[in-house]
């Protein structure tokens, strides 16, 4: 069984290492850490520091950035972060992993949305980390931490376990009833009367129709649930082009796609023909992606996915198109 920590991350990377230390002290070794961040510069510095620190300790790091947003302060950013969080939890539930979720880092909005995502898709444990030491808390901010020597960073990232308060938070995971919730939001019949009562009491449906808030919620769940299953193995990147002018750009994009889409099992480079769309499906399970390099030549990748139906493949294509649009490609 694989143990995974999902953590929201802002300008204090120590909340992640403190969570790992407490879990380890409880006999729960974490094999992989998923870090949810924005593209804010402080969050990126925190991510860089943690990636190096945790990788050196043999812990896998999987960064998931909410592209195009420096903060979660608009309706669009809220929708994007919520979908990303739900996707991560859904994929790990499908894989049968034990998921521990920390909401100690990042903006308050990120913590609130992550908590809501856990209410929907569940987790092994949801918790908050508190260190009752103002001086240590100030030192652990990335703007102070990044300029310290490695041994000084180590002391701040891993304080005495007795200083760390681990606050477990209760929740009720609705994952087993997701399909009924989606049906009810669509106004379709469901055998569970209590689901409609729950959605109605929370302002998500009215007169058997979704409210404006319910439509937004349905939009998120609809996209998450329509995605193909996560790839059971680590995705393979097979690139044939060796020319230096291609190699760096195409490797960068391949790795970004690998991190972003769990339904991708293999990534290959390919030729692009003039007049082709930027994203197109190639049945039964492939998506071809074209992106301009900005250096006078064209690059293309073929993504082999886990899609089993045309609907799943089209849903995956739509997600790739949204990604390309946000990347301004």
Regions found by a protein language model. Name each.
Residues 1-98, 115-329:
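Long, low-complexity, Lys/Arg-enriched
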Residues 101:
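Conformationally flexible catalytic loops at phosphate/diphosphate-handling active centers
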């Amino acid at each position: 069984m694989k143990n995974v920590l999902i953590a929201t991350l802002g300008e204090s990377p120590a909340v992640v290492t403190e969570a790992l230390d407490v879990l380890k002290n409880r006999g729960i070794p974490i094999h992989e850490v998923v870090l949810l961040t924005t593209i804010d510069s402080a969050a990126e510095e925190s991510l860089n520091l943690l990636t190096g620190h945790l990788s050196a300790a043999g812990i896998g790091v999987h960064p998931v950035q909410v592209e195009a947003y420096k903060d979660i302060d608009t309706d669009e950013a809220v929708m994007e972060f919520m979908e990303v969080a739900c996707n991560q939890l859904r994929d790990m539930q499908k894989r049968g992993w034990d998921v521990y979720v920390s909401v100690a880092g990042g903006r308050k909005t990120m913590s609130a949305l992550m908590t809501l995502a856990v209410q929907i898709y569940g987790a092994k444990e949801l918790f908050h980390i508190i260190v009752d030491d103002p001086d240590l808390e100030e030192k652990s901010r990335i703007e102070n931490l990044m300029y310290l020597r490695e041994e000084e960073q180590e002391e701040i990232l891993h304080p005495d376990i007795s200083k760390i308060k681990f606050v477990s938070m209760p929740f009720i995971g609705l994952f087993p009833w997701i399909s009924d919730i989606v049906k009810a939001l669509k106004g379709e019949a469901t055998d569970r009367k209590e689901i409609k009562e729950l959605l109605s009491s929370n302002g998500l449906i009215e007169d058997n129709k979704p409210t404006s808030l319910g439509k937004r919620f349905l939009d998120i769940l609809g996209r998450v649930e329509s995605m193909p299953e996560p790839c059971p193995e680590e995705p393979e990147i097979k690139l044939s082009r060796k020319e230096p002018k291609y190699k760096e750009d195409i490797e960068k994009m391949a790795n970004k796609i690998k991190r972003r889409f769990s339904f991708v099992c293999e990534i290959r480079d390919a030729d692009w023909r003039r007049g082709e769309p930027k994203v197109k499906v190639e049945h039964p399970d492939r998506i071809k992606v074209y992106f301009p390099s900005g250096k006078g030549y064209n690059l293309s990748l073929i993504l082999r996915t886990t899609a089993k139906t045309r609907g799943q493949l089209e849903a995956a294509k739509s997600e790739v198109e949204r990604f390309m649009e946000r990347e301004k490609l």
